[in-house]
A protein has these predicted regions:
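Short, well-ordered beta-strand elements within core beta-sheets of diverse protein domains
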Residues: 65, 84-87, 201-204
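Active-site-adjacent loop/helix segments that line or gate small-molecule/cofactor pockets in enzymes
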Residues: 17-60
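Active-site and channel-lining beta-strand-loop segments
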Residues: 55-77
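PLP-dependent aspartate aminotransferase-fold enzymes
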Residues: 120-205
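Adenylate-forming
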Residues: 42, 84-86, 168-173
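Conserved active-site and cofactor/substrate-binding residues in soluble primary-metabolism enzymes
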Residues: 22, 26, 61, 89, ...
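Glycine-rich loop-to-alpha-helix module at the N-terminal edge of alpha/beta enzyme cores
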Residues: 73-155
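Short, contiguous pre-domain boundary segments
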Residues: 7-15, 48
Length: 205
């Protein structure tokens, strides 16, 4: 986060380029009344950056560019879709592949053959792995890894560094001190709702 926003604005001129319109402000205030935190991901929350200047919403994307609702073209210097768009936004080959799957039907209670193909490719790329387990989110994947580690070692304490989601094993690091996750997730996060029995089982470094 930038502490001296006025100095930042003076040096970059962003205050003139990105000043939020009434439409965007109204939409963001509405979102915060309907959705806890305003959206589903902390990493996409504009309040973490420049609350009065950050575009907040996009209308379209291409390559390394995003367009705000006011159609202002900007270079995405953040994390390109929370790290998922490593090839850039709206990559033709990727878009065509996605459309092809959608046209065939992208959801069923049956298994899709692509799952096996992807697992095979991942094992090929990572010879240290014998099998692959898919998860819906990074937080879920981390929780699976923690459970496997605890099961195989018969030990319960976990040492970690960085952001690992919102599951109890991770947030429990803040039961002892609300400052434990300051450099990993966010400052002063309260561990309310996390079982107190998990205290002293997760340790950030």
């Amino acid at each position: 986060a930038i502490k001296n926003k006025s100095l930042f604005n003076q040096n970059t001129g962003l205050d003139k380029k990105l000043k939020k319109s009434h439409k965007i402000e109204k939409l963001w205030h509405k979102a915060k009344k309907l959705i806890p935190n305003g959206n589903m991901l902390l990493s996409k929350n504009p309040d973490r950056f420049l609350p009065n200047l950050w575009p907040t919403y996009f209308s379209k994307t291409k390559g390394c560019y995003v367009w705000s609702l006011e159609n202002k073209k900007l270079i995405d210097f953040s994390v390109m879709g929370v790290g998922t768009n490593i090839l850039g936004y709206s990559r033709k080959e990727v878009d065509n592949a996605v459309r092809s799957v959608i046209n065939k039907g992208n959801l069923s209670t049956l298994n899709c053959p692509e799952e096996v193909s992807l697992a095979e490719k991942l094992v090929e790329l990572h010879p240290w792995a014998d099998m692959v387990k898919f998860a819906r989110t990074g937080g879920e994947a981390n929780s699976i890894a923690v459970r496997i580690a605890r099961s195989s070692t018969n030990r319960h304490n976990i040492a970690f560094c960085g952001y690992h989601g919102w599951h109890d094993w991770y947030i429990s690091a803040n039961i002892k001190s609300s400052k434990n996750l300051n450099e990993h997730l966010m400052s002063g996060l309260n561990a309310t709702g996390v079982p107190k029995e998990l205290k002293n089982t997760s340790f950030p470094f």
